[in-house]
Amino acid sequence: MDALSFNTNSGYIEALVRGYESALLEQHIYSNLSQCESLEDFRLQLSSTDYGGFLANQSKLTSSIISAKATEKLLDEFDLIRRQADETLSKFMDYITYAYMIDNIMLLLTGTVNGQDTHDLLERCHPLGWFETLPALCVATNVEELYSVVLIETPLAPYFKDCLSADDLDEQHIEIIRNTLYKAYLEDFYNFCKKIGACTADTMLPILEFEADRRAITITINSFGTELSKEERAKMYPSFGRLYPFSTSILARAENAGDVENACSLVKEYSDFFDQNSQKSLDDHFNEKEVELNKLAFLQQFHYGIVYAFLKLREQEIRNLTWIAECISQNQRDRALNIVPIL
C-alpha cells in the first residue's frame, strides 16, 4: 500500500496510535514510582501521567487491581482503534487477538484438567481472546470433542488440523496442543503480513521471526526431562525465523542447555542471551529484545505494525507497573526497578 492510500484509509489511526505511544511512561516516572512508600503514593504519582485518575474510584488498592484497571485502559484504546479500522487493518487486528484466544483455551484446559474452579478460570481469561463458545471448553474431555463442539466455528479451527491426532487431554498433550497451535498461528500471521507487504512487512516480519525463535528456544528448554521425543519437539518449531532452518535442526537434537546455546551461537543477539556473566535471566533478555523490536516499529511510517507494537509495549508497561506496585506492597522497594523500561 502506498503512502497516499494509507494516509487516506488509516492516517487518523496512525496518528492516534503514535499519540498513545508518546504517552508511555518514561524512566524518571518509574524511578518516582519506585520511591513510593504506599500504594496511595503510587496512585498520586500516576495521576499526573496519561493514566490520570484511572484509580480514583478504587477505595482499596492492590497490585492485582492496578493491573486490571490498566488493562481496561488498554482494552479501551484497542477498541477505539478497531472501530476506526479499514478492512485490512481489521483483519490484522483479528490476527492479534488469535494469540489471546489460544492462551484462553490453554488456560481453561489446563485448569479443568487440574480440577480448578470453572468460574475462576473464566474470570482469568483475557478479554481480547474471548469468544462465544469459550465456556464450553470446561466440559471437553478429548481433542475431537474440543474441536467439533467448541472450536469449529472459530478462526482457530484451521490451526487444529495437526492437533486432532492427540489423545486424552492430559497436561503433556495440552502443551503439545498449545505449541502446535502457536506454530500454525505464527506461520499464518507471518504470511498475512508478507502479503500486505511494504512497511507493514518490513516492521512485522522481524518481530514475528523473533517470536518464532523465542518459541523454538523455549520449547526445547522446557522439553528437557519430559517424555516428549525429539521428533515431536521438532514438529512444534515454526518454519521461519532467524534460527530456521539450520539452528532449529540443531535445537531438535539438543539434550541440554549447552546444546541450546550452541544452536543460538550463529545469531549474535541470541548468543548474548546465554552470557554466563550476565545477571539477567533468559526471559529478561527475551523481554528486552521484544521491547527493542517494537520500539523500532515507530521509526517507520504508513504501516499497521505500530498497532501491534503499541499493544505489546503497553502490556510491558502494565507488567512494569504491577511489579513496582507488588514490590511496594511487599516492602521490597529495592527490587522495584527490576523492570524493562520502554522509553
UniProtKB/Swiss-Prot annotation:
GO biological process, one term: vacuolar transport
Disulfide bonds: none
SUPFAM superfamilies: V-type ATP synthase subunit C
MF terms (GO), sorted A to Z: ATP hydrolysis activity; proton-transporting ATPase activity, rotational mechanism
GO CC annotation terms, alphabetical: fungal-type vacuole membrane; vacuolar proton-transporting V-type ATPase complex; vacuolar proton-transporting V-type ATPase, V0 domain
Xref: InterPro entries: ATPase_csu/dsu_sf (IPR036079), ATPase_V0-cplx_csu/dsu (IPR002843), ATPase_V0-cplx_dsu (IPR016727), V-type_ATPase_csu/dsu (IPR035067), V-type_ATPase_csu/dsu_dom_3 (IPR044911)
Localization of this protein: Vacuole membrane
Keywords: Hydrogen ion transport, Ion transport, Membrane, Transport, Vacuole
Principal location: membrane
Highest taxon above the source species: Eukaryota
Signal peptide residue numbers: none
Bilayer topology annotation: Peripheral membrane protein
Coiled coil regions in record: none
Function: Subunit of the V0 complex of vacuolar(H+)-ATPase (V-ATPase), a multisubunit enzyme composed of a peripheral complex (V1) that hydrolyzes ATP and a membrane integral complex (V0) that translocates protons. V-ATPase is responsible for acidifying and maintaining the pH of intracellular compartments. This subunit is a non-integral membrane component of the membrane pore domain and is required for proper assembly of the V0 sector. Might be involved in the regulated assembly of V1 subunits onto the membrane sector or alternatively may prevent the passage of protons through V0 pores.
Description of how the protein assembles with itself and partners: V-ATPase is a heteromultimeric enzyme composed of a peripheral catalytic V1 complex (components A to H) attached to an integral membrane V0 proton pore complex (components: a, c, c', c'', d, e, f and VOA1).
PANTHER family: VACUOLAR ATP SYNTHASE SUBUNIT AC39 (PTHR11028)
Family from the record: Belongs to the V-ATPase V0D/AC39 subunit family.
Record protein name field: V-type proton ATPase subunit d
Source organism: Schizosaccharomyces pombe (strain 972 / ATCC 24843) (Fission yeast)
